[in-house]
Regions:
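Mature, function-bearing regions of proteins
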Residues: 2-230, 234-308
Length: 308
């Protein structure tokens, strides 16, 4: 990247959420899938949708706003304003550009299908099994990020590769926030964390294609990339818990999934791509996550750095 691009990229950290928060900094694979996209949106929380291959879909709502902010406004000042926005119920900082403020107000609204009873069940499960879930976040989901080829390469050749442990620590904030009893409540922080991360992803989509070190035909962080990372978290966690015989009531299991469904929505994943059940999550994961897992030189180096 040019010096100007690096400065702009570094400046828009959305108040402390590092580039690639949630680990979704990934390069869209332009090659055809081994099998055509076939997962039906009828299995989603929306129950319907266009059924387009998520590799061809990004986040136009966020992208247009963030691109204009990066090109036309003082990003350092915006970042300073965003650092003051921490809790879900806080007013959006008045010093932000109007278009960005309007986007944040829109993006932080919980989806209409949010079920607070299910969210409570998810917290009960996390509280009960918190230790083992935390271990899985680190050693299953965290290590898995190094064998997602596009993600590993993108992180390795970005600032995330230079400060990988710091990046993991900041990504872990999302894992912590989602497990709190007030995650999506006014005094919680999860909604803010998700919206800031969504804005960072939009910034990456705008800036990386301008870099001479980035293939111009690749637009990073498609809906597919977000879904791959999403499945490396709740789907992978629940699969391991089930395999190990960790008990979970129906209320707890559905609640844990629901906390991540709401998270996915707030991160900008379209409702038509969010699985409505664990069964659908496993089916979708088989198509989007499992086929891409493979070692790379960059991923091996990141894994080595992570384990030191």
């Amino acid at each position: 990247m040019t010096g100007r691009e690096v400065n702009r990229r570094d400046a828009l950290k959305a108040g402390g959420v590092a580039l690639g928060g949630l680990g979704a900094l990934a390069m869209t694979n332009a090659s055809a899938r081994a099998e055509p996209w076939s997962w039906s949106p009828q299995g989603s929380v929306a129950g319907q949708g266009a059924g387009a291959d998520p590799r061809t879909v990004w986040d136009p709502e966020a992208d247009a706003v963030i691109a204009n902010v990066l090109e036309r406004h003082n990003v350092n000042r915006i970042n300073a304003e965003l650092r003051t926005w921490v809790r879900n119920g806080q007013e959006v900082p008045s010093g932000l550009p109007a278009e960005l403020r309007d986007f944040i107000e829109y993006a932080r609204i919980l989806p209409p299908w949010t079920d607070h009873n299910k969210l409570a069940g998810g917290f009960e499960f996390t509280k009960k099994q918190g230790t083992i879930i935390s271990v899985l976040y680190a050693f299953a989901s965290g290590m898995m990020s190094t064998v997602i080829p596009n993600e590993a390469r993108a992180v390795y050749y970005s600032k995330g590769g230079q400060f990988f442990k710091d990046r993991i620590a900041k990504t872990a904030k999302l894992g912590y926030d989602i497990g709190t009893v007030n995650a999506y409540a006014p005094d919680g922080q999860m909604t803010v964390t998700c919206v800031k991360t969504r804005m960072i992803h939009a910034a990456v989509r705008h800036l990386l294609p301008q870099s001479p070190h980035w293939p111009k035909q690749y637009v990073p962080i498609s809906q597919d990339d977000l879904m791959v990372t999403w499945h490396s978290l709740p789907t992978t966690i629940m699969a391991n818990l089930t395999k190990w015989g960790v008990p979970a009531s129906r209320h707890e299991s559905q609640g844990y999934l629901h906390t991540w469904q709401v998270c996915g929505h707030l991160l900008g994943i379209r409702d038509e791509y969010l699985p409505a059940s664990w069964r659908e999550a496993n089916v979708q994961s088989t198509q989007v996550l499992k086929p891409v897992l493979a070692p790379t030189r960059e991923g091996i180096r990141l894994a080595d750095d992570l384990l030191r």
